[in-house]
């Protein structure tokens, strides 16, 4: 592209680089910062919501700016953020959003009010999220076939990933399970209420609703179910219930093996931006992407230099080094291309599990401006 084209000047390049990073061996990320339309001097005010994770904190506190914008950051919970975007007042210009709820809203209900940027603020391996009763002869994944499994809701991103990996890696179909959706969720104070798109149940499955006064941990503790799929550790596991354990005793090893085999680091949430705002200000997509990336790079820098001091884990440094050895320095990557397989896999799971009406192409979900955004490591 020429230096000036369509009223925008992309000649400046922003280098997320410092001598401190170089000294400790961190990868620098080069980003192209767009300028606003020629002659524009107005500062845009943006309302943004999301969790204030370490990798987002510099943006939330204002240490990192979105070029040409003043930012009002409101911490939120994913259930409420989903409901606000899909059926609420849509107060926020930019919102963290559940990836499966967005896929379902887009595919099933022609939701187009927001579009995604290839920024993924929450990613989690999910082998650790399968909990079992130790008195039900469940010793390996295949033993879940025919068992009764509780879930809070059914169609959340985390649960879709778990069912998908069970199908792909161990041949266990959702139809092989007797499902119980819990009437309550013990993690609601963290995740918020289960949003509408997280509670869709496809036809053809054996699904019943648990007692309205019991949460998912109650069902597992009482023995009403054999196992539990849940994004967050259930109360019974945290409190050391003698008959509750993880399906994978060494879930870390299982997750690392899965990553080495598939290259997938499961994405839970993405960043969505109001489409009408982006249509009027196409430069904003790059500016927002750059800001989230810069905030993440500052977190990398802190992790490498002094993370061991700010975190209570005694072997923090070794954990970070081990992660980088397996996944690379930019292990929490943004941009579509390095994450294409992961997003394609989740779109496939949504369709195969009967949640989405059609199999989406990943390009449909993201703003056209954002398809080519990269972090040049």
Give the residues covered by each predicted segment.
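Pocket-lining segment of extracytoplasmic ligand-binding domains
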Residues: 190-304
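Short helix-initiation/N-cap motifs at beta->coil->alpha
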Residues: 74-85, 177-218, 364-371
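N-terminal secretory signal peptides
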Residues: 1-14
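Short, glycine-/small- and polar/acidic-enriched structural segments
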Residues: 41, 45-175, 179-188
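C-terminal segment of N-terminal export signals and the immediately downstream linker at the start
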Residues: 8, 31-49
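N-terminal export signals
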Residues: 14-36
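Secondary-structure end/capping motifs
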Residues: 272, 277-352
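Conserved C-terminal helix/tail region of periplasmic/extracytoplasmic solute-binding proteins
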Residues: 351-377
């Amino acid at each position: 592209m020429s230096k000036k084209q369509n009223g925008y000047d992309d000649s400046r390049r922003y280098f997320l680089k410092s001598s401190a990073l170089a000294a400790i061996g961190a990868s620098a990320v080069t980003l192209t910062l767009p300028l606003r339309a020629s002659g524009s001097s107005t500062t845009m005010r943006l309302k943004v919501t999301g969790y204030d994770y370490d990798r987002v904190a510099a943006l939330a506190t204002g240490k990192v700016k979105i070029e040409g914008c003043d930012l009002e950051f409101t911490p939120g919970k994913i259930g409420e953020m989903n409901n606000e975007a899909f059926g609420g007042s849509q107060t926020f210009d930019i919102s963290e959003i559940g990836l499966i709820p967005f896929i379902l809203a887009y595919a099933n209900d022609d939701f187009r009010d927001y579009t995604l940027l290839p920024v993924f603020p929450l990613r989690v391996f999910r082998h650790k999220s399968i909990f079992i009763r130790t008195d039900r002869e469940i010793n390996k994944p295949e033993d879940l076939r025919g068992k009764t499994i509780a879930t809070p809701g059914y169609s959340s991103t985390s649960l879709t990933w778990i069912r998908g990996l069970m199908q792909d890696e161990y041949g266990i179909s959702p139809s092989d399970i007797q499902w119980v959706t819990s009437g309550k969720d013990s993690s609601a104070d963290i995740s918020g209420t289960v949003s509408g798109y997280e509670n869709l149940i496809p036809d053809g499955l054996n699904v019943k609703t648990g007692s309205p006064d019991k949460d998912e941990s109650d069902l597992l503790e009482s023995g009403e179910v054999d196992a539990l799929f849940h994004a967050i550790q259930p109360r019974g596991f945290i409190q050391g219930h003698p008959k509750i354990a993880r399906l994978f005793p060494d879930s870390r090893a299982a997750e690392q093996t899965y990553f080495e085999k598939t290259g997938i680091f499961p994405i839970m949430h993405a960043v969505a931006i109001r489409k009408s705002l982006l249509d009027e200000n196409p430069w904003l997509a790059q500016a927002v992407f750059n800001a989230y990336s810069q905030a993440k790079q500052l977190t990398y820098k802190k992790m490498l230099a002094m993370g061991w001091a700010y975190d209570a884990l005694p072997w923090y440094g070794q954990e970070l080094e081990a992660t980088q050895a397996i996944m690379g320095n930019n292990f929490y990557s943004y941009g579509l291309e390095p994450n294409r397989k992961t997003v394609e896999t989740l779109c496939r799971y949504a369709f195969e599990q009967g949640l989405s009406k059609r199999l989406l192409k990943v390009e449909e979900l993201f703003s056209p401006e954002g398809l080519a955004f990269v972090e040049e490591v």
